[in-house]
Amino acid sequence: MARKSLIQREKKRQKLEQKYHSIRRSSKKEISKVPSLSDKWEIYGKLQSPPRNSAPTRLHRRCFLTGRPRANYRDFGLSGHILREMVHACLLPGATRSSW
């Protein structure tokens, strides 16, 4: 189980990313429209003004139950070993164990 502080830090990053998402998107659109290099550099400066933790690349998927940051399945929002346990216990409808 991940520490509570790490999970809270990730939630804080998600809120910041949502807050600054429109600003980043509009700045990137402006860059493609502006022909002069000096204007582009000004817009790049605006892109660097939001906090670092508001960048979408700093977000990390975590397991919904345990907060584990590795081996996450996007479809379920669970880490691999929790997913396996839940499938074995028949808690996920439609998921079957592979057998050959």
From Swiss-Prot:
Its main location: plastid. One of its GO terms (molecular function) is structural constituent of ribosome. One of its GO terms (biological process) is translation. InterPro entries: Ribosomal_uS14, Ribosomal_uS14_bac/plastid, Ribosomal_uS14_CS. The keyword Chloroplast applies. Keywords: Chloroplast, Plastid, Ribonucleoprotein, Ribosomal protein, RNA-binding, rRNA-binding. Belongs to the universal ribosomal protein uS14 family. Binds 16S rRNA, required for the assembly of 30S particles. This is Small ribosomal subunit protein uS14c. It comes from Nicotiana tabacum (Common tobacco).
